[in-house]
């Protein structure tokens, strides 16, 4: 969540709580200027109109997730202590700069984050683990943004050009190009689905046709394959890898949150906020 966004939400919650406790004071003055007066009711309406749906989304999302995927106070406190140790005397300033009112507000954000991480980890099923029970493979690639360019490179490779030299000359992957496109060994699930599907179909030494992924167009060469270990020996490491990859993927987290909210039977009683969950997207965690 962005700090400014959290600050607005926190401020709005406080104001609306005060409003609920004192409706008779809705005409009270919040601020004045020459020929201008801002009443409490006008101020509250503007806040609700501008930020009410964001606030409602955040409140319900946090409530749904933290109640379904419970984490201990000890785990929350450990994360808070880590932050305090990291920032030392600057801890309060860091909270302020990120729009957090106080340590209790920070704890709420940590609790939500830990609960989301727990939800993501529990999303990994036995079927997911078995689907990724594949040997580690080693591959090199040449990455370009244009399909026609990828086809031209493939033609050169088909006529005997060096894969490693073309990778150094043409690849747009700065991390691997100086190594001739070498990506090293990787396990199932480590690469984009498009890349992985193509790579696992290759025989050692074989070069693929151009493969499109969100990163561009890849030409892939399979250069190694490890022996597949017994399932019982590797299933825990496969699960851990999947958990870590999903936790690090913000898109997966957003989709999971949306799925959980759909299952939560949410009913909005305020007509001005009733479309909150059709037009507001999660801000991340």
UniProtKB/Swiss-Prot annotation:
Pfam families (alphabetical): Rotamase
UniProt keyword terms in alphabetical order: Cell membrane, Isomerase, Lipoprotein, Membrane, Palmitate, Rotamase, Signal
Chief location of this protein within or outside the cell: membrane
EC class of the enzyme, as a word: isomerase
Signal peptide region: 1-20
Record-linked InterPro entries: Foldase_PrsA, PPIase_dom_sf, PPIase_PpiC, PPIase_PpiC_CS, PrsA_foldase, Trigger_fact/SurA_dom_sf
Membrane topology: Lipid-anchor
Cell location: Cell membrane
NCBIfam families: PRK03002.1
Annotated protein name in UniProt: Foldase protein PrsA 2
GN (gene name): prsA2
